């Protein structure tokens, strides 16, 4: 951006001229363009301070000043500062109940000419060998099968693309960061691999990794623009600030030069969508900060009290006659001589600090329950023993309540992911085989501790036997079968072979050949 453009932009702003977001970027006025967006990094920095134990309020506890009888300062004594990583524990438990196991992707695309295929299969079965109609039917079936295989192959390519990009690991990372910073983003970008083939990669953006996130949503909560701020170091060892700004039609790479001016490089967004999934939520330990502060203060005070009584202290009820010859700290003492009727004993605690311990236990319960977090102590887990999946569900009801609340948003995030990845496959990764955006892809959240698969299969068999479920659906619910489509083809072949054997036996029986 030239000096002339800088002056022009300043004059326009001074006279109240409203430039659009894209006009500001095109004119090189990146600062004003970024100011039109919501800066997520400020709030993220505040949340990180609450998350990290070393920056908790208790860590600012002032030392105790020790004074003499006249009020003069003798020394200062450091007090205990016990910070408890409740946010870490609460966030990790919430993460496990959302993405402890990867989400399941399912292909619900209607298979083309399915009814026609079924009619041809039935007609094919009743025709005798040698009938010229068989060749025509086989050709039609092969054509229909090719169309259906293209859909299946596209869906498999979709799943392979996510697997190669390590989506399951990245979505966990993005959820973990969002639970800490209240906002994170998965940035999908494409590059060429060592063989020159296009490939998709995912980068999780977070303030803890020095990324600044800026968003612009419309009134319907649709993402209109996204900006990523970051720093690099040039060849002269100077820090260079960057903004990558994404819209559905364009991508701008902005680099700040010396003097504050910007170099702006615009490129077409070939994907056709903003290649970002933004995760937004409240911190997982929301509204428990005051309880956490109180627990940390109580435990620190208890530790101070324990320190005061940890070293033995003598109490004499009369004058010690041989006090001039008392042993030094490093020496052993054997005898104290006191006046008649006197006594010497160690100072002992009488309160046992029960009230404070009770308070800490109650606060701990409140923190976990109000953040919808189960108390997964070793004792509690031992008590569960060989619990079934249903029993674990009841025990983890608080975590499931929170997970169900998160799924209201994450259901949309996963739907956006499938739409975005299909657009990337159509427009960048696999252009010759376009058609991925026509796929109907659904998803399911997996149970964190796995499902009671044997019970599910038993119920599915009962429903199938009663006529309420197709064989194909039964195969899809079986944990013993990896590919329901392949297994269905095998069953069809077995049925055809069985039918042929029956026809052959009937012919042999008609001629009196069968034994």
Regions found by a protein language model. Name each.
Residues 1-200, 515:
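Extended, helix-rich architectural segments
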Residues 120, 126-137, 293-303, 307-310, ...:
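Glycine- and charge-rich intrinsically disordered segments
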């Amino acid at each position: 951006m030239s000096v002339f453009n800088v002056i022009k932009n300043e004059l326009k702003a001074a006279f109240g001229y409203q430039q659009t977001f894209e006009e500001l970027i095109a004119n090189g006025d990146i600062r004003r363009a970024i100011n039109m967006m919501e800066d997520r990094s400020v709030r993220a920095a505040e949340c990180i301070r609450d998350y990290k134990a070393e920056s908790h309020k208790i860590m600012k506890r002032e030392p105790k000043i020790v004074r003499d009888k006249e009020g003069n300062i003798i020394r200062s004594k450091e007090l205990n500062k016990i910070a408890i990583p409740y946010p870490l524990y609460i966030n990790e438990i919430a993460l496990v109940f959302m993405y402890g196991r990867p989400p399941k992707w399912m292909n619900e695309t209607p298979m083309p000419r399915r009814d026609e295929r079924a009619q041809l299969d039935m007609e094919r079965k009743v025709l005798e060998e040698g009938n010229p109609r068989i060749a025509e039917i086989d050709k039609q079936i092969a054509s229909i099968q090719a169309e259906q295989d293209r859909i299946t192959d596209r869906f498999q390519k979709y799943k392979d693309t996510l697997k190669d990009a390590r989506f399951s690991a990245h979505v966990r990372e993005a959820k973990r960061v969002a639970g800490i910073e209240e906002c994170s983003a998965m940035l999908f970008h494409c590059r060429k691999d060592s063989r020159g083939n296009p490939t998709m990669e995912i980068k999780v953006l977070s303030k803890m990794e020095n990324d600044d996130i800026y968003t612009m949503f419309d009134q319907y909560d649709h993402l209109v623009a996204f900006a990523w701020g970051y720093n690099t170091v040039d060849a002269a060892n100077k820090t260079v600030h960057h903004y990558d700004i994404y819209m559905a039609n364009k991508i701008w790479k902005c680099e700040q030069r010396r003097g504050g001016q910007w170099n702006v490089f615009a490129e077409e967004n070939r994907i056709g969508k903003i290649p970002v999934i933004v995760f937004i939520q409240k911190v997982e330990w929301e509204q428990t900060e005051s309880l956490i502060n109180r627990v940390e203060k109580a435990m620190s005070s208890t530790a101070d009290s324990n320190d005061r009584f940890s070293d033995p202290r003598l109490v004499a009820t009369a004058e010690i006659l041989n006090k001039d010859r008392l042993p030094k700290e490093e020496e052993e003492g054997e005898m104290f001589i006191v006046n008649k009727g006197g006594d010497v004993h160690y100072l002992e605690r009488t309160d046992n600090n029960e009230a404070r311990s009770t308070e800490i236990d109650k606060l701990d319960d409140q923190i976990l329950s109000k953040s919808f977090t189960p108390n997964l102590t070793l004792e509690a887990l031992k008590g569960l023993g060989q619990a079934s999946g249903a029993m674990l569900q009841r025990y983890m009801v608080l975590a499931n309540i929170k997970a169900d609340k998160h799924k209201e948003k994450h259901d949309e995030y996963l739907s956006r992911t499938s739409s975005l990845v299909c657009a990337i496959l159509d427009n960048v990764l696999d252009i010759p085989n376009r058609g991925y955006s026509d796929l109907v892809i659904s998803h399911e959240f997996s149970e964190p501790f796995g499902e009671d698969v044997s019970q599910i299969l038993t119920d599915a068999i009962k429903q199938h036997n009663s006529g309420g479920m197709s064989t194909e659906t039964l195969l899809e619910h079986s944990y013993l079968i990896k590919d329901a489509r392949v297994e269905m083809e095998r069953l069809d072949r077995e049925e055809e072979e069985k039918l042929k054997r029956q026809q052959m036996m009937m012919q042999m029986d008609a001629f009196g050949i069968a034994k």
